[in-house]
């Protein structure tokens, strides 16, 4: 499910978009469909990067893209292999709840984002996540699983501590299926 509203973000030709924790590439593919955009997906999981690559290649074969280019990178959000002020848009969807040092990750994300440009961050909603944690210890004790539950106000405060200004809050879905 693509949860980023690209039409609200004024993505322009020539933009460079980073999708951190891209998984199978849902947002990378959506960015690639914008006109003349460079869409970069980054993830630690090689299997997910391979799947994202296959999806992007399918977009190429079907000419289902905006004429730009795409790339993939094996990358850790706490130590991104990109230069400062490199991206016009950074997406970090459903990632920060997995990161022990999430403030280090936020600092890195802000470092690679051009000043004044858009950052899209999503995390699971507080109460559905709290319920999943209560249902099973396995839910939050699985390696690579969720290590924290964010309250909206805390996440906004963490981002603002690194100079990010909130201009919108959007709720794409309120419930999710617990996986473990």
Task: Provide a role label for each language-model segment.
Residues 1, 5, 26, 48-66, ...:
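S-adenosyl-L-methionine-dependent methyltransferase catalytic module, highlighting the catalytic core
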Residues 1-15, 30:
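Conserved alpha-helix/loop element of class I SAM-dependent methyltransferases that forms part
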Residues 14-23:
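Conserved class I S-adenosyl-L-methionine
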Residues 24-35:
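Conserved SAM-binding loop of SAM-dependent methyltransferases across substrates and taxa
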Residues 36-37, 117:
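A short helix->loop->beta-strand "cap" motif at the edges of active sites that frequently abuts
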Residues 38-43:
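Conserved SAM-binding motif I beta-strand of class I
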Residues 78-89:
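A short acidic, Gly/Pro-enriched loop at the edge of an enzyme's catalytic core
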Residues 92-95:
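A short beta-strand submotif of the Rossmann-like class I SAM-dependent methyltransferase core
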